[in-house]
Amino acid sequence: MTQKNKHIFVFGIFAVDLSFYVDKKVKPGETIIAKSSNIGPGGKASNQAISARKLGASTTLITRLGNDNFNSYANDIWRREKLFASTKIDKNLPTGMAGIFIDDKTGENSVIVDPGASAHLSIDDFYSQKSKMKKGDIFLTQFEQSSDTTFSVLKEARELGMITIFNPAPFGIIRKKAYQFCEIITPNETEAEQITNIPLKGKRDVERAINKIRDLGVEK
């Protein structure tokens, strides 16, 4: 299979980001006026799938949405980006949302996330696209769904002969055997420390952490 024929499958959440720019932290019981605000698409999986599509890759997003107005908002975005999204609609839960409070001066932020319907992503969502997956295709997931689901989809994708990429964010505890199903892992410094329990204070620590991650079964 040539590089051009590889298809990227991204498994994970979509959330609507509701961002508020403020000049101070909100105290309990206090109401303040934001300096500005905006609404935008979020969720690591959706953002990664959109980025891959913009770069010209044939891409499928596997996610869940609620039966609400944000459902239409998500589909409008994916349609505009020419991204195919395999979505299951949950009639009893909302589409994922994130409230982001950003300090207008420092840029520091606080985030509250409700994954909504996406919290119930399962292996069944993976199976809905399994017939389209081929050996050599790329499978990318994160840690925004449950650890059991993350383990199961990585295992299934690897057994199909797919190139599996795991972005372990936000960090969570997962069975160590899951790392054997990751061809590539992309932790940042904090996540690498959490996976290995090695404080990264210098080059030698980084090398030790890399070796420990490889010992878990990760190839790259």
Cite the ranges covered by each PLM segment.
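Glycine-rich phosphate/adenosyl-contacting loop at the front of the ribokinase-like
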Residues: M1-R64, N69-N75
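Anion (oxyanion) recognition and catalysis
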Residues: R53, R79, R158-E159, R214
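A glycine-rich helix N-cap at a beta->alpha junction
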Residues: I77-N92
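Conserved phosphate/ATP/ADP-binding segment of small-molecule kinases
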Residues: E159-K220
